[in-house]
Amino acid sequence: MSPIIHSLLDTDLYKFTMLQVVLHKFPQTHSVYHFRCRNLEDTVYPLVDILDDLNEQLDHLCNLKYKEDELQYLRKLRFIKSDFVDYLELFQLKRRFIHASIDEEGRLDIRIEGPMVQAMMFEIFVLAIVNELYFSRIKTDEVWAEGERRLQAKLELIQQYEKSQQPNDPPFLVSDFGTRRRYSFEWQKHVVAAFHNTVPNVFRGTSNVLLAKELNITPIGTMAHEFLQAFQALDVRLRDFQKAALETWVQEYRGDLGIALTDVVGMDAFLRDFDLYFAKLFDGLRHDSGDPYEWGDKAYAHYRKLKIDTKTKMLTFSDGLNLPKAWELHQYFKDRFQVSFGIGTNLTNDMGQTPLNIVLKLVECNGQSVAKISDSPGKTMTDNDTFLAYLRQVFQIEELDEAI
């Protein structure tokens, strides 16, 4: 079977930006990540059928190392430190830290346990492998043709949006955030190249570092939930974990990579911690769950209360978007904020087949549970309901959904 992952750059930029902070600030952290498929009822065949192929792909993944040209590319990114690239030169994923099996209920189970500087780098690779293995068994020429038809329709739609823009209108900016849910690497590259070549004034870049390198476009990304969640188990009061995470980020990047993620314990709790200091230091906020209009209006009110000009701040939306949703949000917020959009599944896996809704999330750090309390029912995730209840209590969050 041919390898699915050919390069350790075939992952999202924020894996590198988060790993650099972990390596510099808390390198001894131990972590556990757990796989979930949120729509098992929609699968054409049982996911467990890919288990043997998955294990073979993991064996290959753990043989990969960074090539010299890849390291040189990373060195050119101004926020990547030279000692971090030196670490990556020695880096290799260790097979003993990841286990794929069938759980007691007959579902595909993937568990990663080991040093966070190792464990956190598996996620995007594994999700991309699971997707490609699953869809390769139901691939037909008709599927690719339908994907191409939908891609061309998207490009035509963006060109219509461009024509409707007035000369002084703020730009409509879209990025590819679809590595983890892609149909295949080949398809993602095709989509990203098509957007880059056809609508270069709209297409801002891709989260995929390998594609950014190969196509000479901007790699996009800052932080994910796992970075903030880890601080729930580090040496700070639980009530202060968000402030500690944001402060650590600021100390590492000194003004670079300034988009903060708001929904680890919900937007309201985030804004209570996002004081004048952070509001001035960070360039903006990323939306990843809950009603995006309500969220953006809350951000607007918060910045206004702090007497900050919202036109100097960026709102990035990345939750289950397609182009019409993004365009409507752009119209709503464009006169108050700079706005950008990260589109994932709808760009890289819109083929007429039901995409897998799969995640591989941090559930434990240093022997202690961590959790995400999303602004969307169903996206909350933990392996420990007792800790989840305590976290809700500490941050005064009503129970709207159950952890999955």
Swiss-Prot record:
Modification type Phosphohistidine: residues: H225
Entry keyword Transmembrane: no
Keyword Transmembrane helix: no
SUPFAM superfamilies hit by this protein: Nicotinate/Quinolinate PRTase C-terminal domain-like, Nicotinate/Quinolinate PRTase N-terminal domain-like
Gene Ontology cellular component list: cytosol
Taxonomic superkingdom: Bacteria
InterPro entries named among the record's database cross-references: N/Namide_PRibTrfase (IPR041525), NAPRTase_N (IPR040727), Nic_PRibTrfase (IPR006406), Nic_PRibTrfase-Fam (IPR007229), Nicotinate_pribotase-like_C (IPR036068)
Enzyme Commission designation: 6.3.4.21
One Pfam family here: NAPRTase
UniProt pathway annotation: Cofactor biosynthesis; NAD(+) biosynthesis; nicotinate D-ribonucleotide from nicotinate: step 1/1
GO BP, sorted A to Z: NAD biosynthetic process via the salvage pathway
A molecular-function term among this protein's GO annotations: nicotinate phosphoribosyltransferase activity
Processing after translation: Transiently phosphorylated on a His residue during the reaction cycle. Phosphorylation strongly increases the affinity for substrates and increases the rate of nicotinate D-ribonucleotide production. Dephosphorylation regenerates the low-affinity form of the enzyme, leading to product release.
Catalytic activity: nicotinate + 5-phospho-alpha-D-ribose 1-diphosphate + ATP + H2O = nicotinate beta-D-ribonucleotide + ADP + phosphate + diphosphate
Enzyme class, broadest EC rank: ligase
Keywords associated with the record: Ligase, Phosphoprotein, Pyridine nucleotide biosynthesis
Similarity-based family: Belongs to the NAPRTase family.
Role this protein plays: Catalyzes the synthesis of beta-nicotinate D-ribonucleotide from nicotinate and 5-phospho-D-ribose 1-phosphate at the expense of ATP.
Name under which the protein is recorded: Nicotinate phosphoribosyltransferase
Annotated source species: Acinetobacter baumannii (strain ACICU)
Record lineage: Bacteria, Pseudomonadati, Pseudomonadota, Gammaproteobacteria, Moraxellales
Originating gene: pncB
